[in-house]
Regions:
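Structured alpha/beta or helical-core interaction and ligand-binding surfaces enriched in interleaved
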Residues: 1-145
Length: 145
């Protein structure tokens, strides 16, 4: 679902994508780790394993790169308890000026996955979708310039 976004980012001379993941929800009767289907709106699911959604980018230290960085830093405003911006040390060692934006409950922000209740999973899904929508809008605006 984010392939077009990644393609658009690849067209920017001030940025390259290091890694990304859409974010996946696993639960009984849905154990495909590549699942991209929305969570069911109703059901008897008690707990959900969430595998984080994120995008890691390396940005050029240029005017365009700095402007894009400023916009990325604003993304957590969607929901700061579930959306973080920062620098992942293991990326920075190989790619200075690399940054990550991730959707993960704040209490688990240093983990790749976590188990949450169904209602929290629904909230995470909404935050993830808003994050990618806003990022796509941002990229589209830059693309038009």
């Amino acid at each position: 679902p984010i392939a077009d976004l990644i393609d658009d980012l690849c067209g920017f001379p001030f940025c390259f994508t290091i890694q990304s993941c859409f974010g996946h929800f696993l639960y009984p009767d849905q154990e495909d780790s590549n699942n991209i289907e929305p969570l069911p709106s109703t059901g008897t699911i008690q707990s959900v394993e969430y595998r984080l959604a994120y995008i890691a980018l390396c940005l050029e230290d240029s005017r365009s790169g700095q402007e894009f960085l400023r916009c990325l830093k604003q993304l957590p405003e969607i929901d700061p308890k579930y959306l973080q911006f920062g620098c992942a040390e293991w990326f920075w060692e190989r790619h200075p000026n690399s940054y990550i934006v991730q959707v993960e409950p704040e209490t688990n922000m240093l983990k790749d996955k976590c188990t949450v209740g169904f209602q929290e999973a629904i909230h995470i899904e909404k935050v993830r979708n808003k994050f990618y929508d806003r990022l796509m809008t941002l990229v589209s605006r830059i693309d038009e310039q």
